[in-house]
Amino acid sequence: MGKLLTMAMPKGRIFEEAAGLLRQAGYRLPEEFEDSRKLIIDVPEENLRFILAKPMDVTTYVEHGVADVGIAGKDVMLEEERDVYEVLDLNISKCHLAVAGLPNTDWSGVAPRIATKYPNVASSYFREQGEQVEIIKLNGSIELAPLIGLADRIVDIVSTGQTLKENGLVETEHICDITSRFIVNPVSYRMKDDVIDEMASRLSLVVEGETAK
């Protein structure tokens, strides 16, 4: 019996892309894997256990060791700054963090208000720009904030830009590109380095193959 590897996976769009990547890497996941409503899924034939978590919680699970490895967006890693190893850029779930707001708006006022799910990232970015701002943390529907006068600008994830467009907002600043990463708990890596290295290697081959296309 090999070592059981527990992997934290984000629910939603990243989960489906990550599951596809694991299958390409040769891991035999059950057909109903993506459709399961379970939060813990065991795949005994691969010595794998999956914990399905909210995207913002994956790094927490890995840092605390309840998951040995995980797949997390770079946005979450920048925001949470957890003590985990970032082993591999999986090059999936591509998007970027951006500043956006209503067009033709004067933003020269004192301490503009910024609404975001990423208060740490936003604070750091505007500090680097030498701009003093007031951060308002929201948990969803960030695009609503400028429309109702809650904030002057927003910092949020942009994929296609369609959501911004539909709400009459325009992107004004590109903060950084985002992809999903394969992350590892430092203690788990010492105890299970063989199986973790194997998974990283198999995933890396798939990523390199996709990038070369």
UniProtKB/Swiss-Prot annotation:
Instruction: State its Enzyme Commission number(s).
Output: 2.4.2.17
Q: What molecular functions are annotated in GO for this chain?
A: ATP binding; ATP phosphoribosyltransferase activity
Q: Which reaction does it catalyse?
A: 1-(5-phospho-beta-D-ribosyl)-ATP + diphosphate = 5-phospho-alpha-D-ribose 1-diphosphate + ATP
| EC supergroup of this enzyme | transferase
**Pfam families in the cross-refs:** HisG
Gene Ontology BP terms:
L-histidine biosynthetic process
A GO CC term attached to the entry:
cytoplasm
- Keyword set for this entry? Amino-acid biosynthesis, ATP-binding, Cytoplasm, Glycosyltransferase, Histidine biosynthesis, Nucleotide-binding, Transferase
* Protein's pathway: Amino-acid biosynthesis; L-histidine biosynthesis; L-histidine from 5-phospho-alpha-D-ribose 1-diphosphate: step 1/9
Give the principal location in a single coarse category. Answer: cytoplasm
The record's subcellular location field reads:
Cytoplasm
- Source organism, top-level taxon: Bacteria
In the record, the note on similarity to other proteins reads: Belongs to the ATP phosphoribosyltransferase family. Short subfamily.
Q: How does it assemble?
A: Heteromultimer composed of HisG and HisZ subunits.
Fill in the domain comment.
Lacks the C-terminal regulatory region which is replaced by HisZ.
Q: What does this chain do?
A: Catalyzes the condensation of ATP and 5-phosphoribose 1-diphosphate to form N'-(5'-phosphoribosyl)-ATP (PR-ATP). Has a crucial role in the pathway because the rate of histidine biosynthesis seems to be controlled primarily by regulation of HisG enzymatic activity.
List, alphabetically, the HAMAP family matched: HisG_Short
Which protein are we looking at? ATP phosphoribosyltransferase
From which organism does this entry originate? Bacillus subtilis (strain 168)
The gene designation is hisG
